[in-house]
Amino acid sequence: MSEMSYLEKLLDGVEVEWLPLGEITKYEQPTKYLVKAKDYHDTYTIPVLTAGKTFILGYTNETHGIYQASKAPVIIFDDFTTANKWVDFDFKAKSSAMKMVTSCDDNKTLLKYVYYWLNTLPSEFAEGDHKRQWISNYSQKKIPIPCPDNPEKSLAIQSEIVRILDKFTALTAELTAELNMRKKQYNYYRDQLLSFKEGEVEWKTLGEIGKWYGGGTPSKNKIEFWENGSIPWISPKDMGRTLVDSSEDYITEEAVLHSSTKLIPANSIAIVVRSSILDKVLPSALIKVPATLNQDMKAVIPHENILVKYIYHMIGSRGSDILRAAKKTGGSVASIDSKKLFSFKIPVPNINEQQRIVEILDKFDTLTNSITEGLPREIELRQKQYEYYRDLLFSFPKPETVSN
């Protein structure tokens, strides 16, 4: 009997009661679990968590106020964005805008069943909305509880749903772990290929390798700069990818002609020069299309005898070195000193050697970063499969009184 057939047999003829989330769960504020230190390090042992995409911000050596999730797992819920994570290891919390959610009665409701159901809900996050979401909204949402009058059978159904979804998430986790291993391998070979001894090849400053462009923000008050825009306007939020051919925001030709931002030819390498992300990493990407930048970005078009892909790989390899050399000290937001950036030196071998290096690294790059090939594509397909079955498993008949 297939897993789905077994579940269908379990569900055959059962009643379902839709109960407010606040009735079957309880929450704790993270106040006594908040981290105090800011100097995170990979050699420390206690993770510092956020409910958002980053999840693990770093590791602390603090030993007091540790949430013991290894003994009793918990859902961490961001009270503003509604992002949530399942946690089954000990941790410290970063933000007070977080709820630690647990089940009121494990003999009636499995917390992981609640977690999987939570993730079937569409996001209701609105930019600029500072309303606390758990009490005002999510605690009132109704969750389907099968066989409410038969706790034993209810738990059996919940457990089976959790077991099936755990298998899907485990498959994705295995692929993600393999991808991370390959990325480390790629970074190692990239750094080896791009290492040259003094005197082996010519060294140039970043300012000498090509033409640099800055960015700007067209006036938000001029609708003609933004409405029906077709020109990518790239900002740090678009730099989660290493190859960029689209952006979240677009501007018009009118904006290019009459604002501080200028059109940059295709095949430039862009970097972030002002953002809190610079406290951790220097985001860089190959911009494959003509585009514009906001004021927190810079881009370079290499000179004719320098391959754009070589510079793309080189900046990716030297990112941490560039940050150490060029990041400004002080200031409320991390930023790059342009003078120090442009004076940073990199090795530039002859064009044939550049081509050889690029061909080798491009093959690795496809395996680790391509969303149409390799592991990233497989992970994306597994995630879609998981979401399909998750939504199917929670598709209980919904009464008219439930408006989730």
From Swiss-Prot:
One of the Pfam families matching this protein, by short name: Methylase_S
One example GO MF annotation: DNA binding
Region of interest: Conserved region 1: 154-199
Superkingdom of this protein's organism: Bacteria
Signal peptide as annotated in the record: none
Region (Target-recognition domain 2): 200-349
UniProt region (Target-recognition domain 1), positions on chain: 1-153
Region annotation Conserved region 2: where it falls in the sequence: 350-404
Keywords: DNA-binding, Plasmid, Restriction system
CDD domains recorded: RMtype1_S_Eco540ANI-TRD1-CR1_like, RMtype1_S_EcoR124I-TRD2-CR2_like
Gene3D superfamilies: DNA methylase specificity domains (3.90.220.20)
GO BP term, example: DNA restriction-modification system
Subunit structure: The type I restriction/modification system is composed of three polypeptides R, M and S; the restriction enzyme has stoichiometry R(2)M(2)S(1) while the methyltransferase is M(2)S(1). There is an equilibrium between R(2)M(2)S(1) and R(1)M(2)S(1); the latter is methylation and translocation proficient but restriction deficient.
Function: The specificity (S) subunit of a type I restriction enzyme; this subunit dictates DNA sequence specificity. The presence or absence of a 4-residue repeat changes the sequence specificity; a third copy of TAEL inserted at position 179-180 changes the recognition site from 5'-GAAN(6)RTCG-3' (for EcoR124I) to 5'-GAAN(7)RTCG-3' (for EcoR124II).
Extra facts: Type I restriction and modification enzymes are complex, multifunctional systems which require ATP, S-adenosyl methionine and Mg(2+) as cofactors and, in addition to their endonucleolytic and methylase activities, are potent DNA-dependent ATPases. The presence or absence of a 4-amino acid repeat changes the sequence specificity; a third copy of TAEL inserted at position 179-180 changes the recognition site from 5'-GAAN(6)RTCG-3' (EcoR124I) to 5'-GAAN(7)RTCG-3' (EcoR124II). The shorter protein is also known as Type I specificity subunit S.EcoR124I.
Entry comment, domain topic: Contains two DNA recognition domains (TRD), each specifying recognition of one of the two defined components of the target sequence.
Family designation: Belongs to the type-I restriction system S methylase family.
Protein name as it appears in the record: Type I restriction enzyme EcoR124I/EcoR124II specificity subunit
Gene source species: Escherichia coli
Organism ancestry: Bacteria, Pseudomonadati, Pseudomonadota, Gammaproteobacteria, Enterobacterales
